[in-house]
Amino acid sequence: MIEILDGMYETINYGDSLGIRLFHNDEYEDYPEHWHTGIEMIMPVENGYTVCAGKENYELRENDVIIINTGVLHSLKAPETGKRIILQFSASLLYSVKEMETLLALLPPIVYIPYDAKDEKLYEFVRSRMDRIVTEYDEK
């Protein structure tokens, strides 16, 4: 759900959530090419989802996770039915943590972590943190 789009620039409305926006998306709606200063994580929980960034199309399956870094031009294509979790957070949250600035500079534009990733520990780490954020966000 893009609320504020000026050309290709999306202003993320974090509301009162301290720089975090999460929504359970089940809309059959494609999102045009856009970019934002926040970092975005997407995980389909029912059916797939397509993320297009640059010349790459990422065909996400259920439980795959994709991380879209700040400033990356991307578009999203939804199937007719499905559900996905979309988490957007301000990069300033991470920049305030000691030594994260260097780490964020090394983060590639897109990080695609499939459910059946060879690096199971990475997937489990990212997924468990995402599940915890969703639980805490939904309880507030």
Which residues make up each language-model segment?
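Residue-level detector of conserved, well-ordered beta-strand and adjacent loop positions
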Residues: 45, 61, 69, 77, ...
